Amino acid sequence: MKHIVKHIHFVGIGGAGMSGIAEVLVNLGYAVSGSDLSRNAVTDRLEALGARIAIGHDAANIEGANAVVVSTAVRSDNPEVLAARHQGVPIVQRAVMLAELMRLKQGIAIAGTHGKTTTTSLVASVLAAGGLDPTFVIGGRLISAGANARLGTGDFIVAEADESDASFLNLYPVIEVITNIDADHMDTYGHDFARLKQAFIEFTQRLPFYGSAVVCVDDPNVRQIIPFISKPVVRYGLSPDAQVRAEDIDARDGRMHFTVIREGRAPLAVVLNMPGLHNVQNALAAIAIATDLGVSDDAIQLALAEFNGVGRRFQRYGEVPSADGGQYTLIDDYGHHPVEMAATIAAARGAFPGRRLVLAFQPHRYTRTRDCFDDFVNVLSTVDALVLTEVYAAGEAAIPTASGDALSRALRAVGKVDPVFVATVDDVPDALAKVAQNGDVVITMGAGSIGGVPAKLVQHIQQKA
């Protein structure tokens, strides 16, 4: 590619999926430019690495580019897209560019409705501990690396494979992981769950004959597609028929202690430095891959025990002063689907037994809120106190029956929790200051702008003091 393409421009370079690819390309020696609507820590990092960053979208931003990379979130009438089309500059989907990176190395692609980012991070961390020095492209910031991407010197590239727009079908890795299959982004599949499952089957068909599909057999939908996978399968999970499984699981001090059982290997005692059964499953995927690639048991144990997590995935901000003179534990999480939320709430209950759980939740997308409305009501009813915001639209038109206010009224009718509804995320710090008490565990959750709230909470309390 490099003998033809010298300069690559990214429309929306500050996004999690785009920025990682851009960083790897910068480190490969390409001239990289990009635009976004606002600056953030990611754009600042890319600029420091040598990328040219423009704030705002303008046709002039693509000057000199040999290719323009877009995600499915970029509209076709974006001025940079229109300019590229007018000038005959190739417009490349993000997943296609990721596929090009995978051609340079052996790809390990992590797919599934939930858990992709954490699992990708665990795989990258375990392989790095084993001396394989992988390249990785992750949808969140790996805290230990301080970045969501890194160019390694080893043979492997570890990356997320996105099913939300079916773009994972552009990838041709040598190892695939399927964590689970759930009903999300159903517009892509015509609201036909069978089509979604078929897409995952087609994803496994991208594997070479020597590749392997590493699949979580605890998920019933994954289990259903296994008979249709024609490539070698490695089963992981808590189920008795898993080839890599966890036994004797014990949650203590915010960590998961368990024994790994692998066919033909001695039992392996593991301590995972994060809570939740779902993260035990994610770790098992990493252990399965690491074992297959010859990583030592000592390296596996070390990597999992020292794993510092991923930004916005049960990210702990420590103790924050509460308005009553005490303090509460603050956690931030990206969860935005009821299944993810239930797993995070269960992890918090396990990590902090007996403590009151306060959730500040921003729903993400009106269509998801509509499609999962009853499930949202059920999962939100399991917390002890709730601050609920209006839906983060993510470019969608409002649906009055699937608004944050409608969700709040439905929760109040069920009667298990009395939500405090606020119209905007800017109102969350003040609402939490009135709700949170000494000894509480407070979780801010959602895939939208609520990710900026934790830093504001500390500032809010300091201003009130």
UniProtKB/Swiss-Prot annotation:
EC number from the UniProt entry: 6.3.2.8
Any Gene Ontology biological process: cell division
Broad enzyme group: ligase
GO molecular function: ATP binding; UDP-N-acetylmuramate-L-alanine ligase activity
Subcellular location as annotated: Cytoplasm
Keyword vocabulary terms for this entry: ATP-binding, Cell cycle, Cell division, Cell shape, Cell wall biogenesis/degradation, Cytoplasm, Ligase, Nucleotide-binding, Peptidoglycan synthesis
Binding of ATP, residues: G112, T113, H114, G115, K116, T117, T118
Catalysed reaction, written as an equation: UDP-N-acetyl-alpha-D-muramate + L-alanine + ATP = UDP-N-acetyl-alpha-D-muramoyl-L-alanine + ADP + phosphate + H(+)
Family: Belongs to the MurCDEF family.
Protein name (database record): UDP-N-acetylmuramate--L-alanine ligase
